Amino acid sequence: EERDRPALIVVDQRMSMFFGTRLNMKSVTAAEAAALAAFRILDQGDRVGGIVFGDNHIAEIRPQRSRRSLDRFLMALADANAMLRADVQRVEPMPLTRVLRAVARIAPRNHLVLVLSDFDVVDDETERLVSGLSRRNDLVVGLVTDPFGDAALPEGLKLVISDGALQAEIDTGDHARRRRLEDMARGRIAGILDWRRRYGVPVLPLSAGEETLPQLRRLMGLGPV
């Protein structure tokens, strides 16, 4: 196994990740998975760094083989996660394209790149950048979801959805609207999962409704703790 390969862990801590219905917020699951992966990478003798981003900030830690670099990454994770609050003022979400361009700059080739996100708002430019990163690096996607988004929406709920600037209330008792929401969520997730076929990118599903460590061990083919 190759040693001292640089690894870059990219962690989404935008407001779209500040959502959870069963166990964790998606932001917490992503942060836990990132921390566990970082420790494992450093223990294997490889360099580790990361990009941690929210809606209006981005922190870059270039890969190094040192505990100090790991500590900087963990601190960036903790700081970004602490900024997520229900009463935070709505801002324009950080575009994934901006983050992926930063990834391409820091990891031009021959890096392990792990991206942990719900991949909210993916467009053609996002996919072009994903394709380019996958050709020059070992790109792995951790698709973070919540069980609420994986199942049929219950009737009789009034949901407030937002794109970061505008808000709208949706009544799930409206069958047509509920079906459109379900189709949109499933279509977005299916599109990300299809990156394996289109770009050869491994897509690892991570649920905020389960403990993070057992999921990672299962995805890596390891037994229970």
Segments and roles (model prediction):
Residues 1-32, 39-225:
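Exposed, interaction-prone extracellular/peripheral surfaces
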